[in-house]
Swiss-Prot record:
Gene3D superfamilies: Phosphorylase Kinase, domain 1, Transferase(Phosphotransferase) domain 1. The gene is mik1. Protein kinase that acts both on serines and on tyrosines. It acts as a negative regulator of entry into mitosis (G2 to M transition). Phosphorylates and inhibits cdc2. The active site is at 417 (proton acceptor). ATP binds at residues 295-303, 320. Belongs to the protein kinase superfamily. Ser/Thr protein kinase family. WEE1 subfamily. GO terms for cellular component: cytoplasm; cytosol; nucleus. One of its GO terms (molecular function) is protein tyrosine kinase activity. The lineage of its organism: Eukaryota, Fungi, Dikarya, Ascomycota, Taphrinomycotina. It comes from Schizosaccharomyces pombe (strain 972 / ATCC 24843) (Fission yeast). Its EC number is 2.7.11.1. This is Mitosis inhibitor protein kinase mik1. Pfam families: Pkinase. Residues 43-71, 148-178 are annotated as: Disordered. Residues 59-71 have a biased composition (Polar residues). It catalyses: L-seryl-[protein] + ATP = O-phospho-L-seryl-[protein] + ADP + H(+); L-threonyl-[protein] + ATP = O-phospho-L-threonyl-[protein] + ADP + H(+).
């Protein structure tokens, strides 16, 4: 790695205070400078019971801002959607906290108030945590998104990938009016999406008109096409982006007729009968099920939340419809292979169960078990706003997902898209691996071009199309690094390259995260050290240096987890021993 490369700077943060309504006086807030949430000394925890109350944020007006403390937007409170609430905190709903409802900030700060002009105390050793690295933590990302409307990741340089473009399927869109198109070409500081929703003199006021949505495009005759040719990557849609326009002058429209059009050309690749076909398959779903609700749409599928048609034995399922148009780009054989793989994996308790499959109007429907607690990505994002996950819980999640991958690999399949958003959480808090859209059998043909999420993709897939079992181990290791360190993994750029080259210098040390707290037991430090060592082996740049799933399950740590774990994967549980007989 070039030593002159500039490390991304962590954005300035300001203080944030938590308050639980009906528990404390709002004029006496508990702040981040108090004691941490966890007290790891056994036998010294106070068994307190607190009534559940609404979690809100506020910022006292008499408090000075500090550049070292994260701030939450006081206009919005955190909304935890995961129903297994007690799995987030220690001893169910914050029992055992040294101070009730005092959340740890992840930084061990002094109680003095500092600002941007305060000199740095060089004698005091700074704590190495997830908030002091070049990578953003989940809490920092949330604060950055609240303060900025744009995605901070989009400003990073692109990461070279083997695919030149990614076609995104969209429903048919209403065409732009001539006035809107001309103004979009002339006004450089106009947002096309915002302007298309303004009231125009000749616009149709009917409620049935479609809203304009941006489609993937290229600006022919401009620099966009040159950038696309110079850097091969998964291209993102290119649109006009600038400040919002509140008013405009109609008399400026004719003068734009003589301008050379350089605005994006929007192309619609869907047929005009897509809406009629959607009505056909939804009507078929309503015949088979009741309470059919769409919950998600991706490039190649629709996902519906349905329930059985017999009320006495009502059961909730998820129906995934593989789009017919998607088969033109991925091949119908890919859809049939996904069905075949899911049918072979029905015996594994850590893989989403396929209940039924059928075809209607050339569209394939998959009926799957419903996981009530959403996906692991959502759980990590919500937990990351409050605290860093304890290493023992990460071990439990790693154990369950390793069993899922081991079952898949024994049948000579590879998943190729392991990431937290494809890991589902059941009602009791256990994990199941889903989304086998990229899964395939081994050996993978050289003609096959498969590529998962670039955040979790293994380096050998991009370098030499080497699809194998180690690629799944690498993606699982990165997913567990995200869970253990509470950082936002980079999509591209310098940090992306460092992780693929085995450079973990900007990742927080799990041992230091524990030592920043008081009264940490030695067994917990050993648990964190062994976890960090294993995750670095799983994400090794060289394929031969990574352990297999069978090697992982044979480790003493995995055997200890299988014998001593009493609760589900995402539920906190305290152990006074680690690898002790």
């Amino acid at each position: 790695m070039d030593s002159s490369t500039t490390i991304p700077i962590t954005p300035t943060r300001t203080p944030c205070f938590f308050n639980i309504s009906s528990s404390f006086n709002e004029h006496s807030p508990l702040n981040f400078y108090d004691e941490p949430i966890y007290n790891f000394s056994s036998g010294h925890e106070e068994n307190q019971s607190h009534k559940s109350s609404k979690l809100t944020f506020f910022k006292p007006s008499n408090t000075k801002r500090s550049p070292h403390t994260p701030m939450q937007n006081n206009a919005k409170a955190i909304r935890l959607s995961t129903t297994v609430r007690h799995g987030i905190f220690k001893n169910s709903d914050l029992d055992g906290c040294s101070k009730p409802f005092a959340f740890s900030s992840g930084l061990k700060l002094s109680k003095k108030i500092v600002d941007a002009s305060t000199p740095i105390d060089l004698k005091r050793k700074r704590a190495v945590t997830s908030l002091s690295t070049g990578l953003l933590s989940k809490r920092e990302k949330w604060s950055l998104w609240e303060g900025n409307l744009t995605n901070p990741r989009s400003e990073q340089p692109h990461t070279p990938c083997k695919k030149g473009t990614k076609i995104k399927l969209k429903p048919p869109q209403s065409p732009l009016s001539p006035t809107t198109s001309l103004l979009a070409r002339k006004c450089k500081h106009i947002d096309l999406d915002t302007f298309s929703r303004l009231d125009h003199p000749n616009s149709d006021s009917s409620d049935e008109t479609f809203e304009m949505e941006e489609l993937p495009s290229l600006s022919y005759g401009s620099e966009d096409l040159l950038e696309f040719c110079e850097t091969p990557c998964k291209s993102q849609p290119i649109f006009l982006s600038s400040s919002h326009v509140n008013n405009w002058d109609e008399k400026d429209v004719p003068s734009s007729l003589s301008w050379t059009p350089t605005s994006p050309i929007f192309l619609n690749i869907n047929s005009a009968d897509d809406y009629e076909e959607e009505e056909d398959w939804t009507s078929d779903l309503r015949i088979r099920f009741q309470q059919v609700k769409p919950i998600h749409e991706s490039d190649f599928s629709f996902v519906y939340h349905v329930s059985s048609i017999n009320p006495p034995t009502e059961t909730v399922y998820v129906v995934k419809m593989l789009k017919k148009n998607a088969a033109k780009f991925t091949g119908k054989e890919r859809h049939l292979q996904e069905v075949s793989i899911l049918q072979r994996l029905q015996a594994c308790p850590f893989v989403v169960n396929l209940v039924n499959v059928w075809s209607y109007n050339d569209n394939i429907f998959l009926q799957l078990d419903y996981c009530e607690n959403g996906d692991l990505s959502l759980f990590l994002s919500e937990l990351g706003l409050l605290q860093v996950m304890d290493p023992f819980r990460v071990w439990k999640m790693l154990f369950q997902l390793t069993q899922a991958l081991n079952f898949i690999h024994l049948l000579e399949f590879v998943h190729l898209d392991v990431k937290p958003s494809n890991v589902l959480i059941t009602r009791d808090g256990n994990l199941k691996l889903g989304d086998f859209g990229l899964a395939t059998s081994l050996p993978v043909s050289s003609m096959v071009d498969l590529e998962g999420d670039r955040v979790y993709i293994a380096p050998e897939i991009l370098a030499s199309h080497n699809y194998g079992k180690p690629a799944d181990v690498y993606s699982l290791g990165l997913s567990m690094i995200e869970a253990a360190t509470n950082v936002v993994l980079p999509e591209n750029g310098v940090e992306w390259q460092r992780l693929r080259s085995g450079d973990y210098s900007n990742l927080p040390n799990l041992k230091d995260l524990l030592l920043s707290k008081e009264k940490v037991q030695i067994n917990k430090v050993r648990c964190a050290e062994s976890l960090q060592c294993l995750l670095q082996r799983m994400t090794h740049p060289y394929v031969d240096c990574r352990p297999t799933t069978q090697d992982l399950l044979a480790m003493p740590e995995m055997i200890f987890i299988s014998e001593h774990s009493q609760k589900a994967a995402i539920i906190y549980e305290d152990h006074n021993s680690w690898l002790e007989t």
